[in-house]
Every structure is written in structure tokens, then in C-alpha cells.
């Protein structure tokens, strides 16, 4: 007889957060425009613009929360965020970093001044 597998109860909702604090405060990122982009681009059952009552996208100051009643991948949210950054030519300055299990954060790339100076001397 095969050993029984422990079955995890299925999650009823998926909740993910995007922290946009630093770029929004610096004025290079528009959270309202990004929220609209997500509403247009998120696919439900293979169709865009089909959020219905299944996926809810909420913006509170500098944070965007995506709540889904169907399975929703955190990786898909990262993909859409990177797509938005590329579309608005922000991909060279910002990166998407997971700060915890349910949260992504937009951070600036860390460029050290020492590397730039040593390259210019050569």
C-alpha cells in the first residue's frame, strides 16, 4: 500500500503586494498608471480585461495589492511589472525584488562609484 500524502488545504485567496514607495516619492513612477496597466493586462481564463469578481487590484498610497480568488502566480505579477518598466524605459534604473513571501518591492540598481572611476583610468 502506498504511503498517504499529506494534502494541504487549497488556498481560497491569493494576495500579493507591490511596494512602489521609493520610485513614486522620487517622481519617476506613476502608481495610478501602473494600476491601470495591471487592470488591462492581467489575464483570467486566458483573456485580458476579464477581471470580473475574480481578481481585485487595489491601490493605497504607494502600494498596490492584487487579490485573486483563482490561482494567481506571484511570478506572473513580477513579469507584468517588468513589462511595464520596459514599456516606460525604467528597466535600466529599477528592479523588482521579493522582500518576503507575498511582497515585491521596486528598488534602484546599486551602482558603485569606485567601479566607474577605475574603468575611466584604464
Curated annotation (Swiss-Prot):
One of its GO terms (molecular function) is RNA binding. InterPro entries: Ribosomal_eL22, Ribosomal_eL22_sf. Keywords: Phosphoprotein, Ribonucleoprotein, Ribosomal protein. One of its GO terms (cellular component) is ribosome. It holds the Pfam family Ribosomal_L22e. The modification Phosphoserine is found at residues 112, 118, 120. Disulfide bonds: none annotated. GO terms for biological process: cytoplasmic translation. Belongs to the eukaryotic ribosomal protein eL22 family. PANTHER family: 60S RIBOSOMAL PROTEIN L22 (PTHR10064), RIBOSOMAL PROTEIN EL22-LIKE (PTHR10064:SF1). This is Ribosomal protein eL22-like.
Amino acid at each position: 500500500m502506498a504511503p498517504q500524502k499529506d494534502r494541504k488545504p487549497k488556498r481560497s485567496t491569493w494576495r500579493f503586494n507591490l511596494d512602489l514607495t521609493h520610485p513614486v516619492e522620487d517622481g519617476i513612477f506613476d502608481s495610478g498608471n501602473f494600476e491601470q496597466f495591471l487592470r488591462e493586462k492581467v489575464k483570467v481564463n486566458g483573456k485580458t480585461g476579464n477581471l470580473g469578481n475574480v481578481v481585485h487590484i487595489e491601490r493605497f498610497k504607494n502600494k498596490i495589492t492584487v487579490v485573486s480568488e483563482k490561482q494567481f502566480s506571484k511570478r506572473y505579477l513580477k513579469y507584468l511589472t517588468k513589462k511595464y518598466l520596459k514599456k516606460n524605459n525604467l528597466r535600466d534604473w529599477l528592479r523588482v525584488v521579493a522582500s518576503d513571501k507575498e511582497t515585491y518591492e521596486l528598488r534602484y540598481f546599486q551602482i558603485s562609484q569606485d567601479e566607474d572611476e577605475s574603468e575611466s583610468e584604464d
